[in-house]
From Swiss-Prot:
It comes from Ruthia magnifica subsp. Calyptogena magnifica. The keyword NAD does not apply. This is one of the proteins that bind and probably mediate the attachment of the 5S RNA into the large ribosomal subunit, where it forms part of the central protuberance. In the 70S ribosome it contacts protein S13 of the 30S subunit (bridge B1b), connecting the 2 subunits; this bridge is implicated in subunit movement. Contacts the P site tRNA; the 5S rRNA and some of its associated proteins might help stabilize positioning of ribosome-bound tRNAs. This is Large ribosomal subunit protein uL5. SUPFAM superfamilies: RL5-like. Keywords: Ribonucleoprotein, Ribosomal protein, RNA-binding, rRNA-binding, tRNA-binding. PROSITE patterns: RIBOSOMAL_L5. One of its GO terms (cellular component) is ribonucleoprotein complex. Belongs to the universal ribosomal protein uL5 family.
């Protein structure tokens, strides 16, 4: 069991249950999954971009990414249906907690001029979305081997009923918000 998973079970769950005044521990919000997505529009012209992104994402997440293909053709973008334009990974259970631990304690402190994430990036249903502009903030990526700086979107899906509950959950995980 990972460090954050034990912390959730032993410290966060009882504290959040008391704070939100819930009788059953199964009602308490928890993180369901983390989805990491890389949109690679530049992969249309250069296939090496897609291969390096797949390799880097597998290093960051610890599992093999899924290649996302274009759903429809768009002539102005020179895009055809079925062309690979991105990759994504969905993390659950053990790998999810390990990734969240590395994200909060290692990757986020390495971001230049970081002042905290916006607390307004919740979607209204208790899920949080954020973007990271450089994949080199993760310690797993070797800076010398990076051919192109790529960003990624990270979606944290929770079982919370509201944004306030989800924010309380993420704050207890020591997630850095502005203000």
């Amino acid at each position: 069991m990972s460090r954050l998973q034990e912390q959730y079970k032993n410290e966060i769950l009882p504290a959040l249950q008391k704070e939100l005044d819930m009788s059953n521990p199964m009602q308490v919000p928890k993180i369901e999954k983390i989805t990491i997505n890389m949109g690679l529009g530049s992969a249309l012209g250069d296939k090496k971009v897609l291969q390096s992104a797949l390799k880097e994402m597998s290093l960051i997440s610890g599992q093999k990414p899924l290649i996302c293909n274009a759903r429809k053709s768009v002539a102005s973008f020179k895009l055809r249906e079925g062309n690979p334009i991105g990759c994504k990974v969905t993390l659950r259970k053990e790998r999810m907690y390990e990734f969240l631990d590395r994200l909060i304690n290692i990757a986020i402190p390495r971001i230049r001029d970081f002042r905290g994430f916006k607390a307004t990036a919740f979607d209204g249903r208790g899920n949080y979305n954020m973007g990271i502009t450089e994949q080199i903030t993760f310690a797993e990526i070797d800076f010398e081997k990076v051919t192109r700086i790529l960003g990624m979107d990270i979606a944290i899906t929770t079982t919370a009923k509201s944004d306030e509950e989800a924010k309380k959950l993420l704050v207890m995980f020591k997630f850095p918000f502005k203000g």
